[in-house]
Regions:
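Phosphate-binding site recognition
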Residues: 1-270
């Protein structure tokens, strides 16, 4: 599926990038539910600009730094001093590079840094505050766990509270955007088909793309595609719950399973 919409969000990212050309650096936080298109939006925004993307995974800090160093060298060249093994050291190296270079640094799934080293947010804050006024970096911090990202950037007890200069909360596509998309479909689509598309996907970008990219445009096809073995929809509820709720997952899953089996009385659900 080709890139559609997001005009306001692209403009906000463009303004932040242009602003970083002149000190100080800019920090943009991009949030939104899983599958809504955050990474695609950022990729579209940075595709013709100097940039490096770091994908954060739950790994040892040493292994993560080794992988992020490779990504940095591939994107920007050999700008990282040899022997770096800490995330703070790598981030500081890029801030130093940003004193004389204008570029974007994207940290995707940023909340996962807490699983690597819980003290990294404080180190990022310290390095950012010490260097942002003399540098030209557009730092884009993106995450799918809304609860975690909200805590990191909106809890006044957290190190990165108040640091973002731009905040983008990406929403699913509205119905009018889906209409403009399906108008380009190779087959005629009825209002019932459009209603089914919006009802099933909620306008979530990846779900819409799953139908469009596979030529699924009619409601009967959509229903069959959604429940077929291997459908991405079958595990989405569990995956979303696991992403947002770390403690007590089994309890919530048991409650949902009981409801799905028709239980309506509290003693039976519990």
């Amino acid at each position: 599926m080709h890139f559609i919409g997001r005009k306001q969000e692209l403009e906000a990212l463009e303004v932040a990038f242009r602003g970083a050309a002149h000190s100080p650096s800019r920090m943009t936080v991009v949030t939104g539910r899983r599958r809504v298109g955050k990474t695609t939006l950022i990729r579209e925004s940075t595709k013709d600009k100097p940039s490096v993307t770091w994908f954060m995974t739950a790994a040892t800090e040493k292994d993560l730094v080794a992988r992020l160093t490779q990504a940095t060298v591939s994107a920007l060249g050999s700008i990282v001093p040899e022997g770096l093994t800490t995330f703070a050291g790598l981030f500081e190296a890029l801030m130093i590079y940003a004193r004389h270079h204008h570029f974007s640094l994207v940290m995707d799934e940023f909340q996962n840094l807490a699983k690597v080293n819980s003290g990294l947010f404080a180190r990022i804050q310290d390095i950012w505050d010490s260097n942002k006024d003399q540098t030209h970096m557009h730092l884009i911090l993106c995450g799918s766990s809304y609860s975690m990202m909200k805590k990191i950037f909106e809890d006044n007890r957290e190190p990165l509270f108040g640091r973002a200069t731009t905040k983008i909360h990406l929403q699913p596509f509205a119905a009018d955007k889906l209409i403009s998309l399906v108008e380009q479909a190779p087959v005629k689509i009825s209002n019932d088909d459009l209603l089914a598309l919006y009802s099933i996907t909620g306008g979530v970008a990846l779900y819409v793309a799953d139908f469009v990219d596979n030529g699924i445009f009619h409601k009967e096809q959509m229903f069959e595609w959604t429940v077929r073995p291997g459908s991405l929809f079958l595990s989405e509820g569990y995956d979303l719950l696991r992403l947002e709720v770390e403690a007590g997952q089994s309890t919530y899953i048991s409650i949902l399973r009981a409801l799905a089996h028709g239980q309506t009385q509290a003693p039976r659900i519990a």
